């Protein structure tokens, strides 16, 4: 309905001087679609009429009162659990206040990006704040609880991203960057966490521009001085001091068996990059027939094994464009980092939102990539331990925890996200608990 309505509205919205006859052409099999469309059109007219009456009676100020009437304090806690997980639909501050001290082995979460998004129409929502200062005032109730429930020596891994401030909102006429990640660092340090550093996760500037329109090629050609760069994501690492700081080992260390976890594997994990063969750049002739996934794979292998050459990088991308192989919806040949603290190989499309789309369910606004969560859990927890996400979303963190032999705990305020997450947690538990052929033979 929204798409059809917008298309119709555009016909007479922009200074139309003559009458317009509108014909809706549909097949006999589409009769129900037409019926539904006309029903929604009638509902739209009724809504416009009511809103017009409200404005006439109360003025524009009355709309704020109407919005306030639609917002409420969350007070309908629900809890579901399995053998390996527990998911709670409630305010995370209230839940953390009831948890035992030193009961969580690892915290992995993606906090709301200040007031950038609101996930629920409740006063409890962390996104329902006027400013960064107000957001962190609300966080002041949660962060001390995370410090209390985390075991000594263990980590809180906080996924954040700097925020884009658009020129039409700031009055600057151009987008600028709000250093939200830096504010987050000082917030957690204020509450006693020790800052251990940050992991940088490269983002796709082409995809980002499709969402924000701030790095457009046409605008850059007009004046490159107003252009910034893409915003990477960060995982900020904070540690609760152990009881004994003489050697700073955690009270319950995260240990690795050298027979199972080799030096070679550690070096690869520490560098956060996967080396593979592919010692030649894809030829321009091969490029004509190769799929973009193959081109991308070979390009990244080549970049990791050779000294970076900017002109060669640009030339290769331009050849892709000539052959019609350069996508406009994602970056095919993004820069490959050789730095150990930058993760440039995260599969950005590998989130639980992919499953949400396949099942035609509501997508999460800011999905957390599975790759990031898996690496953090494997690196900073032992098998069988409890991994907690206070901003659970659709259950990414407990889902990964179960898959990796841990236990998962999450809280989430949005009922739809929480409910969708239950199916993923049950699915993960069923997979790891399913008996193998050898188990059945033993029976």
Set out the residue ranges of the language-model regions:
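Short, conserved catalytic or adaptor-binding loops enriched in Gly and charged residues
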Residues: 14-15, 74-82, 335
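Core catalytic lobe of class I
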Residues: 83-420
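Short alpha-helix adjacent to the SAM-binding motif of class I
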Residues: 6-7, 36, 416-427
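Short, hinge-like loop/turn segments at secondary-structure boundaries
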Residues: 39-42, 175-176, 214-216, 426-429
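Conserved SAM/SAH-binding loop
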Residues: 90-94, 437-442
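Short, flexible loop/turn segments with low-complexity composition
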Residues: 50-58, 249-253, 432-441
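A conserved SF2-helicase RecA2
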Residues: 2-8, 12-73
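Short, conserved SAM-binding/catalytic segment
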Residues: 76-82, 422-438
